[in-house]
Swiss-Prot record:
GO terms for molecular function: O-acetyltransferase activity. Residues 1-12, 71-86, 157-162, 218-231, 332-357 are cytoplasmic. It is found in: Cell inner membrane. It comes from the Bacteria. The lineage of its organism: Bacteria, Pseudomonadati, Pseudomonadota, Gammaproteobacteria, Enterobacterales. The gene is ycfT. It is a multi-pass membrane protein. This is Inner membrane protein YcfT. Pfam families: Acyl_transf_3 (PF01757). Belongs to the acyltransferase 3 family. Its main location: membrane. Residues 34-49, 108-135, 184-196, 253-310 are periplasmic. InterPro entries: Acyl_transf_3_dom.
Length: 357
């Protein structure tokens, strides 16, 4: 990767770390029922609320960058040359790891928590039958909904690229509306909610990126401050879109300025993580399930001392992040060396439609 692109990869690395922390928190802290240390319940609630407050910053910049990086395919690459890399590649990973997660999480729950009632779980990974699993995947009710979204977003943005401005306005309205009139499927709600950020990157990303690089924020400090106040006010009324748009610009500006001032190395931790986001994204959910099912049984039975309990509640998301990151990188390395990266890169489509590398 060229040096000038490293800061973008660093942002991708940060985003996937926040995603891992998000899943680590929601699968653990809300399900605790027993607290021994007087600060344990407070600390658990702090993690839950901290996770909630990160929502406007976690996925929007991730999707903006995803859209920005494929704008060439939107503008100038024929459909036939897009099928392999932009659709088939992602569909393969979505389908393969959707099945892997389903089999793994079903087995883990039968083994570690056979008494757990999953009848009302709306995640394809907890499906009782093949039909339920397929329904969950089709409606984006899966922990892998990000991959589902990438396929849908690309197709929509490429087909309607000549109607970018009016459609972007429509996507903004849909993103706001889904907060008040959601669909029956939580994953589809997330897909609709994040559509403006991807389309913004795909259609207008080049212009925005130029502004991020060339326009100093201090020259427009008053306007930026007023916009931030307005964004926070809207967020308090459950409309996070404006705050997310502001966060995209601020996060990119900070990382770009950091690279310009201090430089970035391709071997830095965030860059390595950013280069392997799909591997970490697809594998971490299985590990998080193992951690939560194992620890919840011990914590709710009060089998550890109050001091151990409090320490675990304090550091668990960071420990989970570390293990999931290392595991994801190892699985990617194994995939490359033992399976020609088949776990994350599909067999090529027939030559007639394959993307020319």
């Amino acid at each position: 990767m060229k040096q000038k692109e490293l800061w973008i990869n660093q942002i991708k690395g940060l985003c996937i770390c926040l995603v891992v922390i998000y899943h680590s928190v929601i699968t653990f802290y809300p399900h605790l029922t027993t607290f021994q240390h007087p600060l344990s319940e407070v600390l658990s609630k702090c993690w839950i609320y901290f996770n909630l407050y990160l929502a406007p910053f976690r996925m929007p910049v991730f999707f903006f960058i995803s859209g920005y990086l494929i704008r060439r395919y939107i503008d100038s690459v024929p459909w036939g040359n897009c099928l392999d890399k932009r659709i088939w590649n992602i569909f393969w990973v979505l389908a393969l790891w959707g099945v892997v997660q389903w089999l793994a999480l079903s087995a883990l729950n039968q083994w570690l928590a056979p008494e757990r009632d999953l009848s009302n779980a709306s995640n394809a990974a907890y499906a009782d039958s093949t039909g339920e699993f397929l329904h969950g995947m089709i409606t984006a009710s899966t922990s892998l909904w990000y991959l589902y979204a990438l396929i849908v977003y690309f197709v929509v943005c490429k087909i309607f690229s000549r109607l970018a401005l009016p459609l972007f306005a429509l996507f903004v309205l849909l993103s706001v509306a889904v907060n008040f009139v959601p669909t029956p499927w939580w994953g589809m709600n997330s897909v609709i909610r994040n559509l403006p950020y991807y389309s913004l990157g795909a259609w207008f990303g080049a212009t925005i990126m130029t502004c991020v690089k060339e326009v100093p924020l201090r020259r427009h400090l008053l306007m930026a401050s007023l916009l931030t106040v307005l964004a926070v006010g809207a967020w308090l009324f459950t409309i996070s879109l404006l705050l997310s748009l502001v966060s995209i610009v601020v996060i990119m500006k900070l990382f770009y300025q950091y690279e310009q001032r201090f430089g970035m190395r391709s071997t830095s931790l965030l860059n390595v993580i950013g280069s392997n986001t799909i591997a970490i994204y697809t594998t971490h959910r299985i590990l998080v399930e193992i951690f939560s099912l194992t620890l919840l049984a011990q914590m709710n039975a009060a089998r550890w001392s109050p001091q151990v309990e409090l320490t675990l509640l304090l550091v668990y998301p960071f420990v989970s992040l570390f293990i999931c990151t290392v595991a994801g990188l190892l699985v990617r390395k194994l995939s490359q060396r033992a399976f020609s990266d088949l776990l994350f890169s599909p067999p090529s489509l027939p030559a007639a439609v394959s993307y020319s590398r």
